[in-house]
Amino acid sequence: MYLIEPIRNGKRITDGAVALAMQVYVQENLFLDDDILFPYYCDPKVEIGKFQNAVVETNQEYLKEHHIPVVRRDTGGGAVYVDSGAVNICYLINDNGVFGDFKRTYQPAIEALHHLGATGVEMSGRNDLVIDGKKVSGAAMTIANGRVYGGYSLLLDVDFEAMEKALKPNRKKIESKGIRSVRSRVGNIREHLAPQYQGITIEEFKDLMICQLLQIETISQAKRYDLTEKDWQQIDALTERKYHNWEWNYGNAPQYRYHRDGRFTGGTVDIHLDIKKGYIAACRIYGDFFGKADIAELEGHLIGTRMEKEDVLATLNAIDLAPYLGAITAEELGDLIFS
């Protein structure tokens, strides 16, 4: 089995969008003479399923404040928070009857964790690992070009406070046709490891797992495929075209409705928005503000605006709002919409 790692010019890449692009590139373009193991860890990100709505699934204000990106994957499933406290083990293998058999693909990981002292780890449900009833790993797999591509996360020491805040939407009154995530009780693996492994780094944990999975003594014994510069150029292009692209990560979201209301010195505002592919598709504004002009004109200006605060503010600031909203300012309306 070949080991492929996200290392370029001797430097480890921890951008979660790049890691996802690498997985897709490997699936579609690398056909070696053996199976492939692709482990990685990355900076904080929220990864959402193909059919999910990023706005519904996440706390957008928290993500922006902490510079945590949202990345949409090409497969279904729910939203997950990932940071450098988790190792993701991915594999690309010939389908010898293993597709859908999570017990079989998980068994080497279970044995490896037992070897490291986490003897309480066990399967739960169809595709999870738990310790003391708390989820420490979730798995998925698909068929890609006749091969089984799958993987699972291993939560060594994830920041659960950040996870809870990132995956807790704080916008009320949102209705969406997207698929909602199911929250699970989660736990960390570190506290269950043997004493000699309690202080290991995420890099050391990754290497220990690789050695156990590949049945080698040291990581230097692994059979590697090093991504070439040509490989990297295609990965770069895919990352920018898709996984760093707002249109894919947000604009590809299902249609949803959004409602906010607030009170200002200039009166009350009750705003209803329909969002389609990340843009305002319909808008209705109600309230007891004192305006002279037809409010439908202002609503029309907002239609077609990208549902990002800077875009909405740019639209509002380009209009003289006084004839429509009286004393209510663009900043007040923008803050209300994105509160």
Curated annotation (Swiss-Prot):
Role summary: Catalyzes specifically the lipoylation of GcvH-L (SpyM50867), likely via the ATP-dependent activation of lipoate to lipoyl-AMP and the transfer of the activated lipoyl onto the lipoyl domain of the target protein.
Binding site for (R)-lipoate: K135
Pathway listed: Protein modification; protein lipoylation via exogenous pathway; protein N(6)-(lipoyl)lysine from lipoate: step 1/2; Protein modification; protein lipoylation via exogenous pathway; protein N(6)-(lipoyl)lysine from lipoate: step 2/2
Protein name, UniProt field: Lipoate--protein ligase
GO cellular component terms, semicolon-separated: cytoplasm
Source species: Streptococcus pyogenes serotype M5 (strain Manfredo)
Residues holding ATP: R73, G78, A79, V80, Y81, K135, A139
Entry keywords, A to Z: ATP-binding, Ligase, Nucleotide-binding
EC annotation from Swiss-Prot or TrEMBL: 6.3.1.20
Alphabetized Pfam families for the sequence: Lip_prot_lig_C, LplA-B_cat
Domain BPL/LPL catalytic, chain residue ranges per copy: 31-221
Ligase among keywords: yes
Protein's UniProt keywords contain Aminoacyl-tRNA synthetase: no
Molecular function per GO: ATP binding; lipoate-protein ligase activity; lipoyltransferase activity
Family of the protein in this entry: Belongs to the LplA family.
Substrates-to-products reaction catalysed: L-lysyl-[lipoyl-carrier protein] + (R)-lipoate + ATP = N(6)-[(R)-lipoyl]-L-lysyl-[lipoyl-carrier protein] + AMP + diphosphate + H(+)
EC supergroup of this enzyme: ligase
GO biological process: protein lipoylation
